Each structure stands twice: as C-alpha cells, then as structure tokens.
Regions:
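Conserved catalytic core of the tyrosine transesterase superfamily
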Residues: 1-248
C-alpha cells in the first residue's frame, strides 16, 4: 500500500489524475515495541555485563573480555546483534576507527566509524585477544553463535534485578537506544534533525528513510515538539508505516 500511495502521489504531481489510497487500506498487524533503556538501566546492565564470567564447561571463551566490547559496539555504533559476530580482524581498522560490515541485512555492505573512546576500547581488547581470524572468536576459532550472546545478555539483565517496563529487553534494543540517543543529542544541540536523518539512515544500514524516521516517534513528547523536527516533511510516512513496522 505504501508503494502504491507514493506512486499515485507521483502521478498526481506529474499532472495525471490518480486515486491515492487512504490509511484505511493499511494492513493492521501488531508492531513490536522496542525497549528504550534509560540511563540508569544502561548503567546497571553494563555493570553486570562487565562482571560476567564463564560457566564451568562452557564452550565459549573469555566472556569477560568479549562481551563488554561486543555489547558496547551495539550500543555506541548502532550495530545489529549479528554484525559484531561477523567481523573479521581485518574488518576493524584500529588506526582510524573504521569498521567494515560485510553482507549484513539484505546483503548490504557498509562502513561505520567508531568514537575515539570505542576505538581505544577495541584496541585494548585486540591487544589481549591475540592472533585470530574473527574479531570476536569462539573457542574453536570460529564465529561466536548468536545463542551464546543472547544467553549472556539475558543473564546480565536478570542480574540487575530491574523491573521490566513492558517487553523484556533484547540485544537488538541496544541498537534502538543508539538511534534514539543520537536523535535526542541532535535536538539538545539545536540541530536540524531532518537534514541529518539521511546520515543516520546510512550509518545504521537502513534501506529507506522510513525505517529511520520511525525512531522519531519513540522520542519523549517534549523532544518530538522540537523545531528541529519538521513533521510536514514527514507527511504520513509514519502513519502509513506504524502498524506494520519491520525491525531493521
């Protein structure tokens, strides 16, 4: 419906009369509500992540070295949970902070730049990890399985003892928090959010701007009213998308 709506608008703009389907034609499906961490929750969560230790008999090695870096990449660089696991050593340039993400969602490659603080953390980890193929290696030298990452994230969250405000947090929600924190920082700095949105979209590897604009609607009400967010420019993108948003 969204593609048809955009196409019929284009036809009308070129002088050809065409019916533009209204929102009543939208397919209604349940949308997952991302868990956006507050500062205290993130502080408690990473306290527990930083203190995780290996289980007796576990096949994974050095969780106390790997997990603090891996989860911070997701939070500080907006990476999808599987992307850090697919990094080879040569994909992480520790001199300039460039990370090459290969064949991620929909087979797309992209480059992202780490902050200086994140680069220093990765450099310190690299010096300890030694010779290897994968930036975050499994005990057999291969890639770490997603199930191990999920298990440790859940373990860390449960150890915080924090109440769950709605849906239980997942590693993917670190990526969502990165997006909303970036938008809130731009608003606080008085920047034009709509002008900067394409940069965030490219950085996160989104296929379309609609996927990135979704995050505007997760912001607190006081921020959504900022002059840096031009709702007229957004049109009805979100109203058309909101009932069938695909997590990206």
């Amino acid at each position: 419906i969204i593609n048809i709506r955009h196409f019929t608008r284009y036809l009308n703009a070129t002088g050809k009369r065409a019916y533009i389907p209204s929102s009543e034609y939208n397919v209604k499906t349940r949308r997952y509500q991302p868990y956006i961490f507050n500062d205290y929750e993130l502080s408690r969560l990473f306290d527990e992540i930083d203190s995780l230790k290996n289980r007796r008999g576990s096949e994974a090695s050095n969780p106390h070295l790997i997990l603090p870096v891996l989860f911070r990449l997701e939070l500080c660089c907006g990476m999808r949970p599987g992307e850090p696991l697919n990094l080879r050593v040569e994909d992480v340039n520790l001199r300039n902070g460039d990370i090459f993400i290969r064949k991620s969602k929909r087979g797309k490659d992209r480059h992202i730049i780490m902050s200086e603080e994140m680069r220093q953390l990765c450099t310190a980890y690299d010096g300890i990890a030694g010779e290897r193929e994968w930036f975050f290696p499994y005990t057999d030298g291969g890639k770490i399985p997603v199930r191990w990452v999920m298990w440790n994230f859940n373990k860390a969250w449960n150890k915080t003892g924090l109440p769950i405000r709605f849906n239980k947090p997942r590693p993917y929600d670190l990526r969502h928090s990165f997006a909303t924190q970036t938008l809130m920082r731009w608003v606080d700095e008085g920047r034009d959010v709509m002008t900067l949105m394409p940069y965030l979209s490219t950085y996160m590897g989104h296929v379309s701007m609609e996927e990135t604009l979704y995050y505007v609607h997760l912001l607190p009400e006081r921020i959504k009213s900022s002059p840096g967010i031009n709702w007229d420019m957004m049109g009805d993108i979100y109203s058309a998308e909101e009932d069938f948003y695909e997590e990206d």
